[in-house]
A protein has these predicted regions:
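Active-site glycine- and acidic-residue-rich loops that bind
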Residues: 168-176
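Catalytic beta/alpha-barrel core
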Residues: 31-32, 53-60, 77-85, 98-106, ...
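Anionic-ligand binding region
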Residues: 128-140, 152-159
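Catalytic cores of alpha/beta
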Residues: 86-96, 129-137, 175-189
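Glycine-rich phosphate-binding active-site loops on the catalytic face of alpha/beta enzymes
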Residues: 104-110, 143-152, 187-206
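Conserved N-terminal beta1-alpha1 strand-loop-helix module at the mouth
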Residues: 11-96, 116, 176, 204-225
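Glycine-enriched alpha-helix->loop->beta-strand junction motifs that scaffold or abut catalytic
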Residues: 47-52, 73-76, 95-101, 116-122, ...
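Short, Lys/Arg-enriched N-terminal segments with co-localized hydrophobic residues
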Residues: 2-14
Length: 226
């Protein structure tokens, strides 16, 4: 049996459609919310200013409720859950309305669990061994994490060479100064970044500033990808 075949029938179409949508958006804001009350004003700025998506990390107690609020208020927004480490967290995220799941590393148990539910999953990898293990699940888009500390774009290009058809979503150390280089490489679907949704800006309620940074990021995508 071809690697990953048993997972494709249920989830591959959704995965492909999701990745096509994310490629158009280009940059996925990686959000850490400590208070669910910030979810709606943040979601509003993301929708209004050109990046209608978010990876809400499961690092805080407010993550689940934040996803639920954003998913209900902005049904057209592509909301995912990041830093998902367990099957229990995956269930909570999906039940709250997450449309895709992201993990910092490759956990076969969690990956299989999410894919069997037919939900798009992007596990993190940074070595050939991890890539090949993930490809056994039929995945052709993987998170490259942590991007900059692991060699950045140069490393991604080196890894991409032997794995024809594999694409990446790099996260970690990507910012307004280096994101153009990543976006210009055709094997990158989208970049994850938190500079436009920095925790201090959210905490201080500076949503107009967040909106400005989001628009600036969206304009970079247009500049590079048209």
């Amino acid at each position: 049996m071809e690697p990953g075949t048993k997972y494709r029938e249920k989830g591959n179409t959704r995965m492909t459609e999701m990745m096509q949508q994310l490629k158009k958006i280009g940059i996925v804001p990686v959000v850490v919310l400590n208070d669910a009350k910030d979810a709606l004003p943040l979601g509003e700025k993301l929708m209004e200013c050109g990046l209608p998506c978010a990876e809400v990390t499961f690092r805080t107690a407010a993550a689940e409720e934040s996803i639920r609020k954003m998913a209900k208020a902005y049904p057209d927004m592509i909301i995912g859950a990041g830093t998902v480490l367990t099957c229990e967290q995956a269930d909570r995220a999906i039940d709250a309305g997450a449309k895709f799941i992201v993990s910092p590393g490759f956990n076969p148990k969690v990956t299989e669990y999410v894919l069997k539910k037919g939900v798009p999953m992007t596990p993190g990898v940074c070595t050939p061994t991890e890539i090949e293990a993930a490809m056994e699940f039929g995945l052709d888009v993987l998170k490259f994490f942590p991007a900059e500390p692991s060699g950045g774009l140069k490393m991604i290009k080196a890894l991409a060479a032997p794995y024809v058809g594999l694409n990446f979503m790099p996260t970690g150390g990507i910012n307004a100064a280096n994101v153009r280089d990543y976006l210009a490489y055709d094997r990158i679907v989208a970049c994850g970044g938190s500079w436009m949704v920095a925790g201090n800006l959210v905490k201080e309620g500076k949503f107009d500033e967040i909106g400005r940074l989001v628009k600036e990021a969206a304009d970079i995508v247009k500049e590079i990808r048209g």
